[in-house]
């Protein structure tokens, strides 16, 4: 967290600028997909799986 910029240095986007942002989709379980493919954050995916097992198959997201 030490390398984060202070909040004053971020620029807030209005709706028209936000419509121009191109990004991927995050599925809430460690999986991220873009046009070029998907990637997995295995630590987050493992935690999501453990949470699902612990609460009877219901996701925590």
From Swiss-Prot:
Q: Which GO terms describe its biological process?
A: defense response to bacterium; killing of cells of another organism
Q: Which organism is it from?
A: Leuconostoc gelidum
Task: Tell me its family.
Answer: Belongs to the bacteriocin class IIA/YGNGV family.
Q: List the disulfide bonds.
A: 33-38
Function of this protein? Inhibits a wide spectrum of lactic acid bacteria.
Ordered alphabetically, the record's keywords are:
Antibiotic, Antimicrobial, Bacteriocin, Disulfide bond, Plasmid, Secreted
Which PROSITE patterns does its entry note? BACTERIOCIN_IIA
Gene Ontology cellular-component terms for this entry are: extracellular region
- List localization entries: Secreted
For this entry, the protein name equals Bacteriocin leucocin-A
Please give the residues making up the propeptide in this record.
Answer: 1-24
